[in-house]
Amino acid sequence: MSNALASAPLDAADYIKSHIRTVPDWPQPGVQFRDITPLLQEPKSLRVLIDLFVQRYIDAKLDYIAGLDARGFIIGPILAYELNLGFIPIRKAGKLPYKRVAQSYELEYGTATVEIHEDACKPGDRIVIIDDLIATGGTMMAGKILLERLGAVVVEGAAIIDLPELGGSKLLREGGLALYTVTGFDGH
């Protein structure tokens, strides 16, 4: 493993965490929503966040950053730009105009589907999937399956926040996906 795949410095991780707002009982009672808006609004905290990801992946010999709909679309293109890589959007069903491949995944009540264009990548391309948060892990696992179906190598899943009590990070690791998260929160 190269030095680019080292952990985030504790002080930077704490700094990032201090810029994430917790909104109690939203979108429903009992949920502690982790709002990254303050992190994005302050130029310094956004720069620290992107620099952490750049430091991690600068020597990883990647071809693309893939971002999960929707907040992965905020961080992913910035990171791709900084690393001089392309960006692959992994969209909710029905949002992509060209030929696409789809993968459904389970939600607490029902299922959802994500899609990518069938020409999004080619066999052997090395990709990191990024999102703001890992909760149940379903969306990121579906993205991994889609990219691997096209022959890509998913090097790692990355997120700003891990909510380990929801089991997503465990599910993803057990499914063979290496993970990197900047910070974590207890609870939902």
From Swiss-Prot:
One of its GO terms (cellular component) is cytoplasm. Pathway: Purine metabolism; AMP biosynthesis via salvage pathway; AMP from adenine: step 1/1. Belongs to the purine/pyrimidine phosphoribosyltransferase family. One of its GO terms (biological process) is purine ribonucleoside salvage. Transmembrane segments: none annotated. This is Adenine phosphoribosyltransferase. It is found in: Cytoplasm. It comes from the Bacteria. It comes from Paraburkholderia phytofirmans (strain DSM 17436 / LMG 22146 / PsJN). The keyword Ion transport does not apply. The keyword Cytoplasm applies. NCBIfam families: apt, PRK02304.1-3, PRK02304.1-5. It is an enzyme of class 2 (transferase).
